[in-house]
Amino acid sequence: MSVMSSANPKFVEILQGPYTGVLTTLFADGSPQSTPVWFLLDGDDILFSTTAGKQKLRNIARDPRATFAVYNPTNDMSYVEVRGTIVVTDDQTANTRDRIVQKHGYADGSAFDAPGTQRFTLRLTPTKIIGR
C-alpha cells in the first residue's frame, strides 16, 4: 500500500484542489529553500513543473529530499505536508506544465514560457504525509 493511498482522504482532497503550495528543497549547507508552486496530484505522486537554471533543480540534483506543504484557503487550519524524494525528468513537450495550469483554469501554459524554454518535471514520491 502506498503512502498516498493510506493517507487521510481530507489530505488527498486538499492535494486535488487548485491551490498554491510551498516546495522546500535543501541548499548544500542543509538550510531550506522554499518556493511557492502550482502542482498536480498524479496517482500516488505530486508533479511540479520548472525551468532550467532554477535553484531547486540544483538542490534536487545534490539531494532529492523535499517537503511540500499546502493549506486549504477556505480553512486555514486544514493543511497537508508531504515529505519524500524527487526525481527530475525532461519535459520538452511541456505536458506537465500544461496539465498543471489547466487545473488552475488556463487552456495551456504556453503564455508562461518564452520560446525555447527548457522545462522539467519534478515528481515527488511521498514517504510521509501529515496534516490537519
Question: Where are the model-predicted features located?
Answer:
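Short beta-strand segments
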Residues: 18-51, 66-70, 80-81
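Extreme N-terminal tail/first-helix region
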Residues: 1-20
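Short, surface-exposed beta-strand-loop junctions and turns on beta-sheet-rich folds
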Residues: 54-56, 75
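A short beta-turn/loop motif at secondary-structure boundaries
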Residues: 29-31, 72-76, 114-116
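Charged, gly/pro-rich active-site loop segments
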Residues: 2-6, 78-132
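Charge-dense, helix-prone N-terminal extensions
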Residues: 12-13, 43, 104, 132
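Generic structural signal for secondary-structure transition and capping sites
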Residues: 19-20, 65, 105, 129
